[in-house]
């Protein structure tokens, strides 16, 4: 078999199972509306949970940062790319979340991969929730450590796996709010199991940070849990992009020595760090609380409006409201019909989700108005969902 034959076979398999992914260029993809080729739809696919990507103050902060620092960092943070703006943001994040240190990364994917790659050795074991993000599971499977997956949100099975004999150390991996199901992890029980076994706990709270909790502190703060490694990302509630790892002083120093994704990547633009500091100020403010309350109201409105036809909904009270339809072709068809009704929703299919669980991943935001949710509900009811 040649490389071209292998590539064509893989593409054919995706085509035959209605799992082929395509990107559609848009003129505006965040906020209340999605705009493309002169048309617009109510946007139920964006992760811009608080609507901050369109916030005038945050946009102005990025512009001011670019005027001061330029549009790029110029290098790795280990060389010349670590600016005063980066340091200020790290200190603000650490203060907000109650950790000694924060380290910035260019993406949540990079942060998760960096942690696993820097920590895991051959004699170690990584025990991960089976529905953890692809960045975590891929890093774990590629690491020299053994990978064991526990049943989704099952602390009892986690404890059983942690109790098995091992020469090395253990790392427990989970998410605060799961990206495809929208449900929350029982973090207190997971932390108890990890601590009982002497394991480190890594929580990726990409979809909780900023969107829930006091001052938007996220899933861990809400559940009174303090993992040794907390990953927060800035492409959701913050409305920007990038990520940070919250940890101890010694762990931060260790990662600065051994986290290759951090050492060998160009640092995020300083202007982006300025914008993120502005976003954090909004998140912590009364305005941020009002936006979280608006988001919570839209979630309640949607779930109440689904009523008796909510059997396909997962048990989610987050901004992520997946409607599981099972078949790939049906998910694509339903997404198409919703767009015809003026609502943009994305069909999520295997391998992103398990076979037989294709779904519409509906995301609600503080930018939505009550009438927008009503329109979505009417479209879903009109198509028998």
From Swiss-Prot:
Q: Which residues carry this modification: N6-(pyridoxal phosphate)lysine?
A: 236
What start-end ranges are recorded for coiled-coil regions in this protein?
none
Q: Which InterPro entries does the protein's record reference? A: Aminotrans_II_pyridoxalP_BS (IPR001917), Aminotransferase_I/II_large (IPR004839), AON_synthase_class-II (IPR050087), AONS_Archaea/Proteobacteria (IPR004723), AONS_Proteobacteria (IPR022834), PyrdxlP-dep_Trfase (IPR015424), PyrdxlP-dep_Trfase_major (IPR015421), PyrdxlP-dep_Trfase_small (IPR015422)
**Does the record's keyword annotation contain Transferase?**
yes
**Per the record, what are the reactions this protein catalyses?**
6-carboxyhexanoyl-[ACP] + L-alanine + H(+) = (8S)-8-amino-7-oxononanoate + holo-[ACP] + CO2
Gene Ontology MF, one: pyridoxal phosphate binding
Keyword Transferase on this protein? yes
Query: What pathway or pathways are given for this protein in its record?
Result: Cofactor biosynthesis; biotin biosynthesis
Give the protein's cofactors: pyridoxal 5'-phosphate
Locate the residues binding substrate.
Answer: 21, 133, 352
Superkingdom of the organism of origin: Bacteria
Q: Which GO terms describe its biological process?
A: biotin biosynthetic process
Keywords from the UniProt entry: Biotin biosynthesis, Pyridoxal phosphate, Transferase
EC id: 2.3.1.47
- Which SUPFAM superfamilies does the record associate with it? PLP-dependent transferases
Residues holding pyridoxal 5'-phosphate: 108-109, 179, 207, 233
General function of this protein? Catalyzes the decarboxylative condensation of pimeloyl-[acyl-carrier protein] and L-alanine to produce 8-amino-7-oxononanoate (AON), [acyl-carrier protein], and carbon dioxide.
What does the subunit comment say?
Homodimer.
Family named by the database record: Belongs to the class-II pyridoxal-phosphate-dependent aminotransferase family. BioF subfamily.
What NCBIfam families does the annotation carry? Answer: bioF
Name-wise, this protein is: 8-amino-7-oxononanoate synthase
State the organism of origin: Klebsiella pneumoniae (strain 342)
């Amino acid at each position: 078999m040649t490389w071209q034959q292998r590539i064509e076979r893989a593409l054919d398999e995706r085509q035959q199972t209605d799992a082929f992914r395509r990107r559609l260029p848009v003129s505006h993809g965040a906020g209340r509306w999605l705009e493309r080729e002169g048309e617009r739809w109510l946007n139920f696919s964006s992760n811009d949970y608080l609507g901050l990507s369109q916030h005038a103050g945050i946009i102005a902060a990025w512009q001011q940062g670019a005027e001061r620092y330029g549009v790029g960092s110029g290098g790795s943070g280990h060389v010349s790319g670590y600016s005063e703006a980066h340091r200020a943001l790290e200190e603000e994040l650490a203060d907000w979340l109650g950790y000694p240190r924060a380290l910035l990364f260019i993406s949540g994917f990079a942060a998760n991969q960096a942690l696993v790659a820097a920590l895991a050795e051959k004699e170690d074991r990584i025990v991960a929730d089976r529905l953890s993000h692809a960045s975590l599971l891929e890093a774990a499977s590629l690491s020299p450590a053994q990978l064991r997956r526990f049943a989704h949100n099952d602390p009892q099975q986690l404890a059983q796996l942690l109790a098995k004999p091992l020469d090395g150390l253990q790392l427990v991996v989970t998410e605060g709010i799961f990206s495809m199901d929208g449900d929350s992890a029982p973090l207190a029980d997971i932390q108890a199991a990890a601590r009982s076994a002497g394991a480190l706990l890594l929580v990726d709270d990409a979809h909780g940070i900023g969107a829930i909790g006091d001052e938007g502190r996220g899933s861990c703060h809400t559940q009174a849990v303090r993992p040794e490694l907390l990953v927060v990302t800035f492409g959701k509630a913050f409305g920007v992009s990038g990520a940070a790892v919250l940890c101890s002083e010694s762990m931060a120093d260790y990662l600065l020595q051994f986290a290759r994704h951090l050492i060998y990547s160009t640092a995020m633009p300083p202007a982006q760090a300025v914008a993120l500091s502005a976003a954090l100020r909004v998140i912590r403010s009364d305005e941020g609380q009002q936006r979280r309350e608006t988001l919570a109201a839209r979630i309640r409105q949607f779930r109440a409006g689904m009523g008796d036809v909510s059997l396909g909904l997962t048990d989610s009270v987050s901004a992520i409201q997946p409607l599981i339809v099972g078949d790939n072709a049906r998910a694509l068809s339903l997404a198409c019909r919703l767009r015809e009704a003026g609502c943009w929703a994305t069909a999520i299919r295997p391998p992103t989700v398990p076979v037989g669980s294709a779904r519409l991943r509906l995301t609600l935001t503080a930018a939505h108005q009550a009438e927008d949710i009503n329109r979505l509900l009417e479209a879903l009811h009109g198509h028998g969902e």
